[in-house]
């Protein structure tokens, strides 16, 4: 049935093989799936048809696919043949175009051959013309050069005593022709130029000094000529040596008062500048001539400092150096044209060796602090030397550091250019003191075990930082504001250091509590000796507390007084911890004694009662021991109730007191029973 069905319906025409895909017994899209599986495909197909039908449909579908491939191949081949024929036609067209282009290019070259030759001849003539013109210019330049040398030599042969404006203008004209020559000259011409210019320079410099000392009218023209010949430095040197130095500096000046001499020079320089500006007028005293005269005056100051102020520039007397530098800085700040003479003004300031000055002012303090930092130098000086209304400093190194900081920032020492070095010096001293405090803390903990020295160390550690911080607010920040420096980063630096100081102070406080508690425990440990005082000693029963209790409380009060004297910020807390440690230690030791008495004293008590029946005594040695510890605990408890303690803190003491009351009641009952038994017997 499948074959008859295929023969009737599968072909649309004898030339075209066509099948109706909808009537196939399978779905051809299954072949396009990536997960195609033969077994699965056959299972699906057999649900619709038998194997024979499936085989026939597969053959028909295969034939259809083959026919489609043949048609595609035929179509591609036809396109290929058509494309090949078109390419052949295109190649013929390209060959024809190439032949036409070559023919046209040959005709163009032939037609322009004569024009090209003419252009080459014109270019050759132009090159010859340019060469001739260059030679003409060179010859003309050489003529002007030689004429200028000749004219200048004639003018300089008999130079005038005082140069007129006309003479200077002629000299300027000839000098410009000399310097304007751009072509190379012979050695003889160069030598002649050098000689003429040196003679002209000498005449102009001498005239420049006369003009500067007189009306200054020719000075701008003289400066222009010397600028052209690049000889202004010669005029500067002559003005400094022959005019300014000779007029402002007395060779017999008193070297003992260098500050006064420097002040006179600065005033004379300012006055000379004002005189030149007044004589030349605002029309001429500007631009290059003003810059030249300013640099000349500043050059004179540099020369003066080198010759007369060497002992000041390299400081031997720091106070004189400080005053001279401030005077110089004031002169620099008030110089009228500082924006154009910044380099010269900086050179004047650099004449003062600030690094040497800084080292001279700080070296002795650094050396002194290093000497005072050894443990052997730790001592408490006279408190009368401490200043009023300021935290007290005991140790020599602490006082030396605050003195050094106040000294270097004082108005007699401080200089704005070394503010960075002064701040570094301040920080180094603070860090050095911090390290010293750590070292001394460890020394007192591990070797000396001295709580009083530890209290002194704690006081100096906190007070020094507070002094420096207050000093920074009162003095250092003001100096930073004067030079427009933001103080916020520096304040943060001190705050960070303060946190380190606070942490160290907490450690020192803990060490104070630990060491003092050890000493206090040694005193309270005498509670263990109470049994020795009453066992077999026939002492009367105790009626008050022991002496060691009073001594221990006096020791705590001495600690409190010491801390209050040092204005310790946590005095009450430290005393509370020390007292609590003492109470707990007493409770532990007291209970040990009571436990020992109860464990070993019952048999002794019975024996002593038998041996002392005739005496009528009812108080045993154990009772005396318990009474003594009771009185001691009661005294501690009474003392503690006047302080700030919670009920939980005093539980141990209360238990010791209550323990005696309980034992006393038990003893009374027991004694009553024993007496009744004895009466019955």
From Swiss-Prot:
Principal location: Golgi
Membrane topology type: Peripheral membrane protein
Q: Which Pfam family would be a valid example here?
A: COG2_N
Tell me where in or outside the cell this protein is found.
Answer: Golgi apparatus membrane
Matching entries from InterPro entries are given as:
COG2, COG_complex_COG2_C, COG_su2_N
Specify whether Protein transport is a keyword of the entry: yes
Q: Which intervals of the chain form a coiled coil?
A: none
- Family per record: Belongs to the COG2 family.
Function text: Required for normal Golgi morphology and function.
- What protein am I looking at? Conserved oligomeric Golgi complex subunit 2
